[in-house]
Amino acid sequence: MVSMTSDRIRIKLKAYDYRILDKAVTEIVDTARNTGAAIAGPIPLPTQISRTTIQRSVHVDKKSREQFEMRIHKRLLDILEPTQQTVDALGKLSLPAGVDVEIKL
């Protein structure tokens, strides 16, 4: 019979604000440690930066431009040898708004 839990759970988190992201990571780490699972990470992944340049006025002044950038911060967590209790606790966990979570079992 195949067990419901695998050898590890890989959690990838993304957010625009690194402070909210770090709060979410600490909540996940605390929850996993309370259930007795070992944790590898959090591993900071490279920040994705996308820059956009637009003209300030519509028809005149080509030299007058404005630049905007958007940063996406990422973290990676591995929960090693999770128990069923760990999986249930992570399922009930509520994370801050603005954090994208990808979970691979």
Swiss-Prot record:
GO biological process: translation
Function: Involved in the binding of tRNA to the ribosomes.
Covalent S-S links between cysteines: none
Protein name: Small ribosomal subunit protein uS10
Molecular function via GO: structural constituent of ribosome; tRNA binding
Keywords: Ribonucleoprotein, Ribosomal protein
A cellular component annotation (GO) from this entry: ribonucleoprotein complex
A family per Pfam: Ribosomal_S10
UniProt record similarity statement: Belongs to the universal ribosomal protein uS10 family.
Record organism: Maridesulfovibrio salexigens (strain ATCC 14822 / DSM 2638 / NCIMB 8403 / VKM B-1763) (Desulfovibrio salexigens)
PANTHER family: 30S RIBOSOMAL PROTEIN S10 FAMILY MEMBER
Alphabetized PROSITE patterns for the sequence: RIBOSOMAL_S10
Assembly and interaction partners: Part of the 30S ribosomal subunit.
Top-level lineage group: Bacteria
